[in-house]
From Swiss-Prot:
Reactions catalysed: (2E)-4-hydroxy-3-methylbut-2-enyl diphosphate + oxidized [flavodoxin] + H2O + 2 H(+) = 2-C-methyl-D-erythritol 2,4-cyclic diphosphate + reduced [flavodoxin]
Record-stated family: Belongs to the IspG family.
First and last residue of the signal peptide: none
EC class of the enzyme, as a word: oxidoreductase
InterPro entries reported in the protein's UniProt record: Dihydropteroate_synth-like_sf, IspG_bac, IspG_bac-typ, NO2/SO3_Rdtase_4Fe4S_sf
Domain of life where this protein originates: Bacteria
Function: Converts 2C-methyl-D-erythritol 2,4-cyclodiphosphate (ME-2,4cPP) into 1-hydroxy-2-methyl-2-(E)-butenyl 4-diphosphate.
HAMAP family in the cross-refs: IspG
Source organism of the structure: Frankia alni (strain DSM 45986 / CECT 9034 / ACN14a)
Protein's name in the database: 4-hydroxy-3-methylbut-2-en-1-yl diphosphate synthase (flavodoxin)
Cofactor: [4Fe-4S] cluster
Residue intervals passing through the bilayer: none
Length: 384
């Protein structure tokens, strides 16, 4: 008897075809089209405190942030925009709510883009023509940022709550107003705190327009909860080819948002991988403290800028096999560790020397890879 498993002749594409979107430029960062998915964050400082804001932007830039947003709730904040936009190493987006006058202030200040929330700016529809002319004159894009928590009351009355359809209709309606003034330098976000609603809304948008999409789960929560929500939502959409720029919203320092966002892109193969640790959950077979060993190796290799794969294994079940598949690895057991380099055992060391030995070997391999012209960027570590 012949059993057919229905396996494809060739591996399926890991991700869906990238959605075609028009490309805009936020400062020197292209968004949409064939441009890589970019990572954004938002300052938590008072925008009026120029020095504090610029210091935080410098930290975000160092962590890999490509575009930063700042809040503009007051005239003092609006007055600070010019200095911030001029001195920031990355493009600055002004985040505007309630007061349309700050949209014009942000454009005049030289911000790279402006985010507007049509749900809470009074008489926003009446100002679209002026905003479109000002933005077009300055050559900057507008982000139409719809949020479930501030949805237009007309749409709440129509749909009863912030449904995917309501979020999408709000965004497309505002786009149509800008289009009436021949302005299409637009990107869109439709954020919701529920990842499922958010995913559905972005799918609707992706089918309805070709504007670039900014992905975000609003009010995602503390670091752990927000990371889970954003990872689920972004992973689902990006795997379908939907999404051109992302911001992970966390009740945590903004640098953490950038780290999580970058890691999501790396996990999907949309960025060259950095230090990656894949560790087993540990079990009764483990003959070493996997948790401690993994954390020590991770800390010791943090910041390495070559795509090096390191395996740190806690038992003999998967250990030798995983270690052989890596550039560098250790299979631990019986108080010692076998060190593998390119699949071959090169030495056996006492357990107390495993971390030190791995770091030394990793540095040596990194130097060799750099000398060989390996693209810098991001080591990969496997722990199990």
């Amino acid at each position: 008897m012949t059993v057919t498993l229905g396996m494809p002749a060739a591996p399926a594409r890991p991700l869906g075809t990238r959605r075609h979107s028009r490309q805009i430029n936020v400062g020197n960062v292209p968004v949409g089209g064939d441009a890589p998915v970019s990572v954004q964050s938002m300052c938590t400082t008072l925008t009026s405190d120029v020095n504090a804001t610029l210091q935080q932007i410098a930290q975000l830039t160092a962590s890999g942030c490509q575009i930063v947003r700042v809040a503009v709730p007051s005239q003092d904040d609006a007055d600070a925009l010019a200095a911030i936009a001029r001195k920031s190493p990355i493009p600055v987006i002004a985040d505007i709510h309630f007061q349309p006058k700050y949209v014009f202030a942000a454009i005049d200040a030289g911000c790279a883009a402006v985010r507007v929330n049509p749900g809470n700016i009074k008489a926003f529809d009446d100002k679209v023509g002026e905003i479109a002319r000002a933005a077009k004159g300055a050559g900057i894009p507008i982000r139409i940022g719809v949020n479930a928590g501030s949805l237009d009351k007309r749409l709440l009355a129509k749909y009863g709550k912030a449904t995917p359809e309501a979020l999408t209709e709000s965004a497309l309606w505002e786009c149509s107003l800008f289009e009436e003034h021949d302005f299409r330098d637009i990107k869109i976000s439709v954020k919701h705190h529920d990842p499922v609603v958010m995913i559905q809304a972005y799918r609707l948008l992706a089918q309805s327009c070709d504007y670039p999409l900014h992905l975000g789960v609003t009010e995602a929560g503390p670091a752990f909860q927000g990371t889970v929500k954003s990872s689920v939502a972004f992973g689902a959409l990006l795997a379908e080819g939907i999404g051109d720029t992302i911001r992970v919203s966390l009740s945590a320092p903004p640098v953490e948002e950038v780290k999580v966002g970058t890691a999501i892109l790396e996990s999907l193969g949309l960025r060259q991988r950095k230090l990656e640790i894949v560790s087993c959950p540990s079990c009764g077979r483990a003959q070493v403290d996997v948790y401690t060993l993994a954390n020590q190796v991770s800390a010791g290799l943090e910041g390495m800028e070559v795509p090096l794969r390191v395996a740190v294994m806690g038992c003999v079940v998967n250990g030798p096999g995983e270690a052989r598949e890596a550039d560098l690895g250790v299979a631990s057991g019986n108080g010692k560790g076998q060190i593998f380099v390119k699949g071959e055992v090169v030495k056996t060391v006492p357990e107390a020397q495993i971390v030190e030995t791995l770091i030394e070997e990793a540095m040596r391999l990194a130097e060799e890879m750099t000398a060989d012209g390996t693209p810098s960027g991001e080591p990969s570590v496997t722990v199990s």
